[in-house]
Amino acid sequence: MAVQAQYLDYVLEQLAGLERMNTRRMFGGVGLYSGELFFGLIDDDTLYFKTDASNAAQYQARHMPRFMPPANRPMGPMGYHQVPADIIEDGETLVAWARQSVAVALASRAKQAAGPRKKR
C-alpha cells in the first residue's frame, strides 16, 4: 500500500533522535533502518516496529495488531507490531520504542549469523 509523503515526514520528524536513521522504499511501503538494521516499516500510513519476546508484550497489552502482508503475498503475520498512536505522538517515547526494535533487529541478525544449531 502507498505511504503518503506527509505521514512519512511526520514519522521521520518524530524519530529525529534515533541514531543513523534512514529509509528505503519497498513493496509500496517504506522500510525504516538504523544504519543497516531493518527495525520497522510503514505500510498504508501505518507504522510498525520489529518485535520479539523481549518487547512484544507492550504491544499486545495495547491490543496492537501484527503486520500482515497483502493477500497476494500469503506469508501470515510477521514479527512487526503496529505502533500505538499515542506513542507516535510522543517523540521521546517513540524513539525509546524504536531503540528496543533496533535491539531486536540486532539480536535477530546475531542469531542468523550464528547459523542453525547442530544436532548431536
Task: Indicate where each model-derived feature is located.
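Charge-dense, helix-prone N-terminal extensions
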Residues: 1-120
